[in-house]
Design a protein with these regions (language model features):
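Membrane-proximal intracellular helices of multi-pass ion channels
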Residues: 1-483
Length: 483
């Protein structure tokens, strides 16, 4: 049974929270005295009205949520948040197309960072701040924020969290989820503030520092500059952002363990070690290629490689260099990183490293099984046996993401987008990365995509952000059955 009133109440509260965020951006617009102020005021009125109507409809709701309600709330929340979040762009006239405005907002809320803007600097400060804030909110999840608020209304947030964190994670957060959510948001905010301070020390304006800190911790990648991080020509800024993108790619429950003094448990985590060594391996490989086959000196080759590898693997999408100008072997590694992603339970997109670890262990077991058909070969990660059901889920997820990628690549090719560009756009969208390949690489916007392709990409961003099953489950007949 789906609790419609409770769902309306939660979504209404979400819209009221979005209104508060829009009002913050209204303050920024007022401070700079720019012409986007009316758009924010209209948006605040519309969003408040819609939120109050939904909250009113759910005022006498039974205070409980099922897992089914959780999946529905998560999917609707991202769509509704994006639909209302696009209004400042659209009403201000800076993005006069509904398709483009929704694409830009979904790209932010899903922490993808792909943009249709040809010149980012044309946007006034209020819209730039809202654009940056969408990825910061989306990075950790609109729903996770709500979980920290839900206990105020006496609602158990476990079912909602189960839908948002549908991938395999380090540890399930159970009855004390409200407390844990507050801890995570405190850490998230603290990391953002430290990043802001360090970027400002490096010469960025305070406004740019805040916006880029939002982008780095949310692994979104929206910059306030068309040239992205290349605009600043600062090795210091590149190293600082590399550090914070790396941190944001770590499972936040592990960061919580670190903050609470459980260092040993954190550093022995199998997924974290895989994530770290992937970055080391790809960075050294690309550094060697750039050093040997281009005119870059050793330090520049290393810094460029490190920044782009972390940026792409964490699905942030910042750019200091157009990797499409690199030797083919070097830029050919980018789609692998896009699809792989960082750690589960982080703000990054992609398949997540833990799934890769499980797949590798399953593959190794199959070789052993060929030699020892009757052997019992459990898969252990962090000293815990991975249940066959979880192994099946990982295999199903892998098959599904490859199937969706293949189908959408064909769809984009049917829209007369070349093969290389289609592959890059699809993998970047479903991996929530941002830059793609070819004409949609880091040096270009996605404005040239046909409108139909932009809607396909928006759907892929949503699917990637919510781990596929959360959204696709809504289209199965069993989901809507009463029992």
């Amino acid at each position: 049974m789906i609790h419609k009133k409770m769902i309306c109440k939660v979504l209404g509260d979400l819209l009221l929270i979005e209104t508060a965020m829009i009002l913050l951006c209204t303050g920024v617009s007022l401070f700079y005295g720019e012409n986007d102020l009316p758009a924010f005021l209209y948006t605040a009125c519309i969003t408040t009205g819609a939120g109050m109507i939904l909250a009113l409809f759910g005022r006498n709701a039974e205070r409980q949520l099922t897992r089914r309600d959780g999946y529905l709330i998560v999917s609707l929340a991202w769509i509704i948040f994006s639909a209302f979040g696009m209004l400042p762009f659209y009403l201000s006239g800076y993005i006069p197309s509904i398709t483009n405005a929704f694409f830009e907002t979904m790209s932010g809320v899903s922490s993808t960072g792909a943009t249709i803007l040809e010149k980012v600097e044309d946007l006034p400060h209020g819209l730039l701040f809202w654009r940056s804030m969408t990825q910061w909110i989306g990075g950790l999840g609109i729903i996770l924020f709500t979980i920290a608020v839900l206990p105020i209304f006496g609602i158990n947030g476990v079912q909602v969290f189960a839908a948002e964190a549908s991938g395999p994670t380090h540890d399930k957060v159970h009855p004390r989820i409200g407390i844990t959510a507050r801890w995570i948001w405190s850490i998230y905010t603290g990391v953002t503030l430290i990043a802001t301070l360090l970027l400002a020390i490096g010469g960025m304006s305070w406004f740019d520092s805040v916006c880029h800190a939002f982008a780095a911790t949310g692994t979104g990648g929206f910059s306030t500059r068309t040239a992205s991080i290349a605009y600043y020509c600062s090795p210091y800024i590149e190293y600082v952002l590399s550090l914070f993108m790396f941190i944001s790619g770590i499972n936040f429950t592990l960061i919580l363990l670190f903050v609470t003094g459980h260092f040993k448990k954190m550093f022995h985590d199998a997924e974290l070690k895989f994530y770290f060594w992937c970055i080391v391996g790809f960075t050294l490989s690309i550094s060697a290629i750039l050093y040997l086959k281009t005119t870059l000196d050793a330090e520049t080759a290393f810094r460029t490689s490190l920044f782009q590898v972390i940026s792409i693997q964490t699905s942030t999408g910042f750019a200091t260099n157009d990797y499409m100008t690199w030797p083919t072997m070097a830029w050919g590694m980018m789609p692998i990183l896009m699809l792989m992603g960082a750690c589960a339970g982080s703000t990054s997109g992609g398949m997540k490293c833990i799934r890769i670890v499980i797949l590798v262990r399953v593959m190794k077991n199959e070789f052993k099984r060929l030699l020892h058909p009757n052997a019992v070969l459990p898969i252990r990660i962090n000293k815990q046996v991975i249940a066959p059901t979880l192994q099946s889920t990982v295999l199903a997820f892998t098959f599904l993401i490859l199937l969706i990628c293949f189908a959408c690549i064909l769809i984009l090719m049917g829209l007369e987008i070349p093969l290389t560009e289609s592959i890059g756009v699809v993998i970047s969208s479903i991996g929530n990365t941002g830059p793609g390949l070819g004409a949609f690489g880091p040096a270009f916007s996605w404005n040239a995509l046909p409108d139909a392709a932009k809607w396909v990409c928006s759907l892929l961003m949503l699917l990637g952000r919510l781990e596929l099953f959360t959204v696709l489950l809504l289209f199965t007949p069993d989901f809507w059955k009463r029992n």
